[in-house]
Every structure is written in C-alpha cells, then in structure tokens.
Amino acid sequence: MAEQAASPASLDGWLALLEQRHGQRVELGLERVAAVRARMQAESDAVVITVGGTNGKGSCCAMLEGILLASGYRVGCYTSPHLLRYNERVRIDGRDADDAALVAGFAAVEAARGDTALTYFEHGTLAAWQVFAAARPD
C-alpha cells in the first residue's frame, strides 16, 4: 500500500498541490463530486440558490447576499473565479472565509476522495461545501 503524502498546512500549499495535480483531461459529469460529497458527511439543510448564465452572476450573488443579510439570515456565498485572493470565493455572512476554514475544507475533501480524481474547481467547490456545513448558514 502506498503511503499517502502529508496534507499541506497552508492555503497556499493546498492551492499549489491542486494546480500541480490537475491534469489536462476533464471527465464531465457530477457523479465523482456527488460520491465524494456523500463520503464527506458534510450535511446541510441550508437553502441553495444557484446563479448561472453568461453575465451578471457576481452582481446577482452580491445583491442576493446583501438582501438576505439585511433580512437577518446567515448566508454563505460561493463564487468563482476570485480576483485577488482565493478566500474571496467562499464568504460567510459577507466576509471572506479565513485560511484555517479553507484548509480544513480542503483536508476534509482529501480525506474523503480516496482514489477519485477531482479538478481544481471540483476540489474547491467541495471544500466550500465543507466550510458552509461547518458555518451552518440558513
């Protein structure tokens, strides 16, 4: 049995590992992501709103986040890509997730994925799911 390498201790370490690991070939479909998410046992009863389309997703998310926060809800928001720092992608109650929360999220995904290959985006999305499950948004 191959010994598993130690997980990075920093957010920069995780991002570098994921960039290095990501291959040129991407398998389409959500089956791999769903399987890893189920193994993570990061359950959440939060309402999920998906915003898609070509233009205006960031503005729409910012507006929804602002409305929900002003209404007293606990809100998680996941967007991509980031502008300056990876932390911008994952927000809890209008604040960027801290490095420690993201590192814990990446580690949880890594522990659950086994031999399942994930892209940079998929790993990051599942890490965000873990951060949200821990934060318990409405």
What would you call each of these model-derived segments?
Residues 24-26, 30-44, 70-138:
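ATP-dependent carboxylate-amine ligase catalytic core
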Residues 1-53, 60-62, 66-71, 78:
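Short functional linear segments
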Residues 55-57, 82-83:
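Short active-site-proximal "capping" loops at secondary-structure junctions
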